[in-house]
Amino acid sequence: VTAAQFMRLQPQQQGVSNWQHFNNCCNAGGLSDAQKEVCNMLAADYILANTDRHLGNFGFLRDSETLEWKGLAPIYDSGTSLWQMTLTRAISADAMVPAKPFETSQQSQLKLIAPYVDLPLERLDGFSGKAKDILEDAAQFDDGRAAKIAAAVEGRIQMFRLNRA
């Protein structure tokens, strides 16, 4: 069930933000951990500069027999990540990157979600180097693009750490 469909569990009251309405629907569906799980997903989107996490690009699992809500579906559709449509020279950790679904910029969405994220950030140590190696081996990039993406990912990891402190 997409998040857009899930958010129809109850009507959105006037003056209630989409973020608060989403959390109200999670509570109504008995999914108390969903806020944390969505924040973790959006944190990954921030680090990878995913620009297309709209309400149709994540969702929830239900038991097909009992219709009980089971939780957040695994992450899917991250195809507009890693500065995919950005010229190499413009790739930067602090560049303005649009966000969805709860804010319009990734910086403002990061401020919204940071208090709820519980990712073990120490597991990201060395991630940007591994990403660089994978991109250099697998992709048909121009010279320096993999290194530029890796540096930007590392910068975003560091900015995320600062926002969590």
Name each region found by the language model.
Residues 1-50, 54-55, 59-165:
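Anionic ligand-binding catalytic core segments
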